[in-house]
């Protein structure tokens, strides 16, 4: 199969990644599942032709020397792709990631309405958290797109790699890719404030220094958006604090209580027909009560507060799962499998409401505690 046809098929099927490896058919990832494109496995010769055929002379020389090469290609009438070429078992291969030009809309992704409000926030730190492949980049792109269309200013995005290409609309959008436009996140962030930003997006917080920059940007009156690998809001706060030595924890809790705007946690769950996935969103908003708990380091109390604060735009994963199950968007089994507390979610479903269910559950727990005493 011709390489260009593989790229076109990937776009037509809505694939996110294309895998080219000797010994298996060319495969693409669609809705989180890797599916073969053809029945025939690629030979080492075919794989080499695909890999080297996508490179220019400079890239081939780099690949021959280091056995690694990252670059971008454009296919006319098809799209742009980020390529990561490599060797495995002495044979070459590559993975291509489709670079999105069409920026998703918040409403199209069925994200909570509070996300629009957060996108227009003047200052503060907003963390998007979740495992790899849970749609954090897509939701962030929608959020930046909303800001870009509805305000004026300068958005600086530092990513590794760039997954969505934003056009200049209401805002000037500066997108810098680590390894191509800048040496590292730290080097780029060091110079960011000199570039007069209004919004700063940090593709991923991996180090203490990057986390320090995130808080600093919020402190200096900027809106900082960043992603972090964590399963939920509580775990995100625990991960942030673990970047720092114990003697700094009290100061970090104070800094977060003052500068954190929100934590948005995300999962993706298959739809019942298996043809798509639904985003499940947990939202922690830094209200005065939340700020007080964070300042004290009492993260374990946040979940209960979130469950009772729907009017502030907050919701827990279990409440979001209940809503998706109630509207028929996910199955009962998948809802329970992804719940923070399967027992709490079962009770919500049995009672037939998320908010009232949470209050009744809290009351039930209080009664049980009294009986235990």
Feature names for model-found ranges:
Residues 1-373:
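Short, flexible helix-loop junctions that flank or precede catalytic/ligand sites
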């Amino acid at each position: 199969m011709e390489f260009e046809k593989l790229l076109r098929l990937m776009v037509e099927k809505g694939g996110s990644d294309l895998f080219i490896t000797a010994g298996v058919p060319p495969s693409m990832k669609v809705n989180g599942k890797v599916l073969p494109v053809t029945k025939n496995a690629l030979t080492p010769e075919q794989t080499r032709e695909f890999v080297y055929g996508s490179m220019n002379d400079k890239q081939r020389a780099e690949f021959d020397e280091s056995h690694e090469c990252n670059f971008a290609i454009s296919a006319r009438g098809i799209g742009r792709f980020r390529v990561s070429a490599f060797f495995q078992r002495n044979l070459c291969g590559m993975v291509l990631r489709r670079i999105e030009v069409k920026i998703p809309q918040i409403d199209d992704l069925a994200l909570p309405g509070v996300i629009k409000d957060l996108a227009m926030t003047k200052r503060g730190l907003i963390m998007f958290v979740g495992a790899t492949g849970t749609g954090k980049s897509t939701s962030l792109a929608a959020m930046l797109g909303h800001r870009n269309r509805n305000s004026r200013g300068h958005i600086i995005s530092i990513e590794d790699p760039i997954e969505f290409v934003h056009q200049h609309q209401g805002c000037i959008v500066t997108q810098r890719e680590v390894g191509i436009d800048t040496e590292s996140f730290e080097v780029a962030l060091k110079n960011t404030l000199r570039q007069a930003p209004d919004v700063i997006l940090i593709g991923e917080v991996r180090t203490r220094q990057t986390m320090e920059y995130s808080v600093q940007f919020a402190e200096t009156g900027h809106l900082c958006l960043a992603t972090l690998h964590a399963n939920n809001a509580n775990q995100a706060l625990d991960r942030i604090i673990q970047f720092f030595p114990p003697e700094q924890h009290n100061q970090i809790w104070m800094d977060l209580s003052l500068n954190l705007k929100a934590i948005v946690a995300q999962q993706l769950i298959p739809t019942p027909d298996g043809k798509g996935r639904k985003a499940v969103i947990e939202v922690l908003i830094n209200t005065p009560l939340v700020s007080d708990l964070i300042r004290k380091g009492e993260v374990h109390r946040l979940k209960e507060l979130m469950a009772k604060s729907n009017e502030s735009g907050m919701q827990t994963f279990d409440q979001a799962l209940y809503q998706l199950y109630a509207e028929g968007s996910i199955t009962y089994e998948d809802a329970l499998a992804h719940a923070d507390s399967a027992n709490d979610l079962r009770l919500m479903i049995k009672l037939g409401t998320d908010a009232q269910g949470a209050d009744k559950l809290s009351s039930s727990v209080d009664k049980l505690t009294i009986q235990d005493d």
